[in-house]
Amino acid sequence: SLHDALPILFSAQMILSAISTEKIDKTLETLLSAPVSRLSVLTSKMLAAGVVAALQAVVYMFGMSKMTGGLTEGMGDTSAYESAMENFGLTMSIGQYALVGIQMFVSILISLSLSMVLGALAKDAKSAQTMLLPITFSAMIPYLLAMVVDIRTLSPVIKYIVYAIPFTHTFMASENVMFGNYSLYAGGLIYQIVLLVVCMTVALKIFMSDKIFTMSIGGKQRTRKSFAFKKK
């Protein structure tokens, strides 16, 4: 549902805006030039973002449980309904809710690490908003597909392309744990953790290098154009 995509998008926008604003205002340069380990700076940012991500995952799971519980509030005696839902395997235990929350938490961490890298590439406020588009598309494509088709029934090529998008596994998490597809759930979670390590490694290399102060997407092309204009 849309409740799966919103925490990912909100957290990505939050950290991307923070990093890009710090870079544009030269606050990031001052911070990384201070007599403090850059690893400590990056770690503190990720810890703060991780706490926010954990809170968002908890709020998400609380909202999800309240939403599913609210569907039956106006039905009066719900014992027969609840029994039918249990017979069809359409209920989730606390442990299953926790599994879904864990995958949501990892997905938010992935979006945060990607946002840190993309935010470091922004050269102005306008480009910072554009940098959010890859994460938005990565979240919305599997979300929209999951609404209209069963991703597991797609052709192998398309299915594995969709599986390569890390957020796909988050949108399928509740379905997987509800119907006992724990192998697919575990595979998706392992893939997400590996991708998270890769994204964090890239972010660490960028923040540990002085290139973070000058690197940006499109900056060189703009310089060449301006030089050609001055030459004329």
Residue locations for each model-derived region?
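Transmembrane helix boundary and interhelical loop/hinge segments in multi-pass membrane proteins
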Residues: 12-34, 209
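Short helix-loop junctions at transmembrane helix boundaries
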Residues: 57-99, 120-121, 148-153, 173-177
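Membrane-interfacial helix-loop-helix junctions in multi-pass membrane proteins
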Residues: 89-94, 144-194
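A structural motif at transmembrane helix-loop-helix junctions in multipass membrane proteins
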Residues: 91-137
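Short, small-residue-biased leader/transition segments that mark boundaries at the very start
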Residues: 2-6
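Junction motif at the cytosolic side of a transmembrane helix
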Residues: 117-124, 194-232
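Hydrophobic/aromatic residues in alpha-helical transmembrane segments
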Residues: 11-15, 63, 114-117, 170, ...
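Selective transmembrane-helix segments that form parts of the transport pathway or gating/packing helices
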Residues: 36-68, 101
